Amino acid sequence: DDLPIPFRCVSADAVTGERIVHESGSLVSAIRSSISIPLVFSPYPYEDDRLVVDGGVVDNLPIALARSLGADIVIASDVNALQLQSYEELESLSVMAMQTVILVTQEKAAMQHPLADLLFLPDLRDIYSLDFTKSEQIIERGRQAVEAKRDELAALAEKIESSRGLVALDSNRNGAYSLQPTPTILQ
């Protein structure tokens, strides 16, 4: 809450599936908790001896959560995409497990689309969701999605500015990232 705009992220209890909204404490720990993608990163230790995983397991596009926390404008980017095009691609148990997760999270995310003021849908169908070697392509697809909605983005910015004004960028602002403790990562 010390940030100019309150930051929230979501993780899930690895045993109970309880959604955990990180509202205070270490920003580094909150982010590390929320990116603990199952089968990629180990679960992250959370208070009370619990382990947490990526919040996408329970809420991969938390637009409704943002609204419930008081967000009056929500700009979202849905990066859920079905990558498989045929049954032959279900070549292993791990691919089947990932496809199952994608099917569930994609349906949940799509239900929240109407709640966003502006929604970007980058075309990532041909990029495997865990392929971290294609970051440049992913960023470019994101740029294309934003460019496709340039007029809507400009209209939203105009609406915000007319209602309350935009805050000027302060290039001298120093964040508190360097003050955060280093998280312990399970091996």
Regions found by a protein language model. Give the residues of each.
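Patatin-like phospholipase
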Residues: 1-187
